[in-house]
Every structure is written in C-alpha cells, then in structure tokens.
Amino acid sequence: MRILITNDDGVHSPGLRLLYEFASPLGAVDVVAPESPKSATGLGITLHKPLRMYETDLCGFKAVATSGTPSDTIYLAAYGLGRRYDLVLSGINLGDNTSLQVILSSGTLGAAFQAALLGIPAVAYSLHAQDWEEVLKNREALEIMKAVVQKSAEFVLKYGLPHGVDVVSINFPRNMKRGVKAKLVRAAKFRFAQKVDRRVDPRGSSYYWLYGTDLAPEPDTDVYTVLVEGQIAVTPLTLDLNALNTDRKLDAEALAKLVRYINEAI
C-alpha cells in the first residue's frame, strides 16, 4: 500500500511530521507538501506560473516541498512523481476545519477533495488548538490522535470509503484525554460571523482584514461536537454538488462501522 501525506500548513509543520509518524507503519509513505503555509486556498490550483518541487530532509525523513497549493501537491505527486496512491492523508491541521463555511475554503480539505477528484480515497485531520507547543506537551492527546489516524487510515485501506462518501474529515477537540469518543456528525453551515476590518495606511489608502467572530454552535454538528462536547467529529463529505442528484445514498452501516473501528482504539 502506498500513502500520500500532505497539508496546508507547510512542509515544516509539526502536524505533518506527526501524520507521517502515525501513518508510516501502514505502508510506503510519501510526503509532498507546500514549502510554506497555504491556509484557506481551498481547491485552488496554480496555472499562471510554473511549479517547483525539491527534496528536503525533515530531521529523519525525506519530503518533497512544492511551490504550489495543497491541491497542486496532489497533481504533482500523482503525475509529476508518477506514483499510484491507495490513500491520501491531509493534515494534521493546526485549527479545526468545522462547518461548510470553513471546509470549502480549507487547504487541508482542498487537498483531500483534489485526491477524491482523481479517484483516490482521502481523509483530512484537523485539531482545535492555537499552537503546537501546547499540543506536543499533551502525551495523552498525541496517543489518541495516533490511534485515530491509524485506525481510520487502516479502515479505508481495508474496506475503502463507505458508498456515497468521497472524503472523511476528522476534527479533534482541544486538550483530549482518555474517554474521548468519536461521533459521526454532519458539518454545520457556519462557524463564524464574517467581518471586514477597514484600515487606512500612512499614505491615506484603505486596506482590509477579513476575519470572523464565533457563532453559537448548532447542536448535532461538527462544530458543536468539537467545541462544546469536546469529542472527535467524524464528518463524511461528498464532492457531488448537484442539487438534481437524488440517486446518491450513503452507506450508513459502513459509516457506523468506521466510527466503531476508531472508538475501539481509543
């Protein structure tokens, strides 16, 4: 089995290293990731300039850094390196990727969706945290993430994604401890109230910052599960945006099996 690992936080992110370490026992692993952070790039690909790839040593393992977006890395790995992948793992992202509002702009999910477009099963992992220093001190949380990554990846390699699912998004809560459980939940529509902050530079020209303020989480969604309940949200996603498609049916039994598979490990 060959696994491709990527992210949107950049090739030097601790989350990428963790994902590599967690996934390595499952098969041959390639790491191809952006050379610098590319958050909120969604499914964006680079068409207006050439892309570069170069090998880099990340203190014990080799990775390929690219000048492109997370979505570009999928194309470059599949076609530039000419390799065939059984699974793509994207993450572990610093910051949760909950709600459709965030999912549709996320580079972490963008890479996973790009893999799905190429017919490769994909799982994206994100963590509700503000800095890696806090996370890396929590050995209990690291062991939980390791178990979830290994079991979810193992499940997809063994059984494939459940029918009707193109990507699985897994969001970890902050400060996880033993007893935490994975829950199968849908994505909320919104996570933030969108804001624009207009400012004026010393020359009198306007410039703008985009930001958001937290909304009250909607129950029975990924946002509520992670932020309020402190549990792990497992959210199946589909690429099919066609409103006229009434034929797509989810394999609920297989999805429930995936969550059981994860919970048995934590």
From Swiss-Prot:
EC code: 3.1.3.5
Cofactor note: Binds 1 divalent metal cation per subunit.
Keywords from the UniProt entry: Cytoplasm, Hydrolase, Metal-binding, Nucleotide-binding
Cellular component aspect of the GO annotation: cytoplasm
Taxonomy, superkingdom: Archaea
Classification via Pfam families: SurE
Main location (coarse class): cytoplasm
GO molecular function, one term: metal ion binding
Named cofactor requirement(s): a divalent metal cation
EC top class, as a word: hydrolase
Catalytic activity, reaction form: a ribonucleoside 5'-phosphate + H2O = a ribonucleoside + phosphate
Residues annotated as signal peptide: none
InterPro entries: SurE (IPR030048), SurE-like_Pase/nucleotidase (IPR002828), SurE-like_sf (IPR036523)
Binding positions (a divalent metal cation): 8-9, 39, 93
Compartments (UniProt record): Cytoplasm
Record's function text: Nucleotidase that shows phosphatase activity on nucleoside 5'-monophosphates.
HAMAP family referenced in this protein's UniProt entry, alphabetically: SurE (MF_00060)
Family: Belongs to the SurE nucleotidase family.
Protein known as: 5'-nucleotidase SurE
Source species of the chain: Pyrobaculum arsenaticum (strain DSM 13514 / JCM 11321 / PZ6)
